[in-house]
From Swiss-Prot:
It comes from Prochlorococcus marinus (strain MIT 9215). One of its GO terms (cellular component) is cytoplasm. The lineage of its organism: Bacteria, Bacillati, Cyanobacteriota, Cyanophyceae, Synechococcales. This is Uridylate kinase. Inhibited by UTP. It comes from the Bacteria.
């Protein structure tokens, strides 16, 4: 089963690759080539991108910044990533539009739901930047929100690990991977996949979440085709 309309959540860290900070052009190129394969299958793809490779609001808040101010700085970081991703996508021939939750008309369109859906219908990729435009909400929650708004069939969370585990697989060799689990299990066991607001939004709107490894070439197109390459939350 190939999904027809997908919301892909890319963390800022995914764009960082092995670098300690910023954007790795090779990773952007690899993601762009994968996205091209997806678009060629006539799949409608929207992307929400994080900003943790540049600035993380929670970290800024922990370091003494006002939380709302820190979150706004984080939103600007996501716009930088969105524009960089647009550049990478267009270099491989993928028509792309960036829409931001905070208006900045000189560099991106404002987020307008109907316009975003029209872009998708025309075969363009839409990259959402600026989070949801409000502090105190993560980009994972933005992904769940935008997925519900554009009627996406699935949220695909691209991460550094190949699915959801019962504990950190980088620290514990006996970590158990889940092939599937329920929203309720994630919420009740406080499994660190997404924040609880994002999980609850997906649960309330019956949008499944696929968690998979972004660094394995071809995984985006495999996930879109419904191949069991990660963990499915439903």
């Amino acid at each position: 089963m190939t999904y027809k309309r997908v919301l892909l959540k890319l963390s800022g860290e995914a764009l960082m690759g092995e670098k300690p900070y910023g954007i790795d052009p090779a990773i952007v190129q690899s993601i762009a080539e994968d996205v091209l394969k997806v678009v060629e299958k006539n799949v409608q793809l929207a992307i929400v991108v994080g900003g943790g490779n540049i600035f993380r609001g929670l970290k800024g808040s922990a370091d003494g910044m006002d939380r709302a101010t820190a979150d706004y700085v984080g939103m600007l970081a996501t716009v930088m990533n969105a524009i960089s991703l647009q550049d990478g996508l267009e270099r491989v021939g993928v028509a792309t539009r960036v829409q931001t939750a905070i208006e900045m008309q000189e560099i991106a369109e404002p987020y307008i739901r109907r316009r975003a859906m029209r872009h998708l219908e025309k075969g363009r990729v839409v990259v959402f930047g600026g989070g949801c435009g409000n502090p105190f909400f993560t980009t994972d929650t933005t992904a769940a929100l935008r997925a519900a708004e554009i009627n996406a069939e699935v949220v695909m969370k691209a991460t550094k690990v190949d699915g959801v585990y019962d504990c950190d697989p980088n620290q514990f060799k006996d970590a158990k991977k889940y092939s599937s689990l329920s929203y309720q299990r994630v919420l009740s066991d406080e499994i660190a996949v997404m924040d609880s607001t994002a999980i609850a939004l997906c649960k309330d709107n019956n949008i499944p979440i696929m968690v998979f490894d972004i660094f394995k070439k071809g995984n985006i197109s495999k996930a879109v085709a419904g191949e069991p390459i990660g963990s499915l939350i439903s």
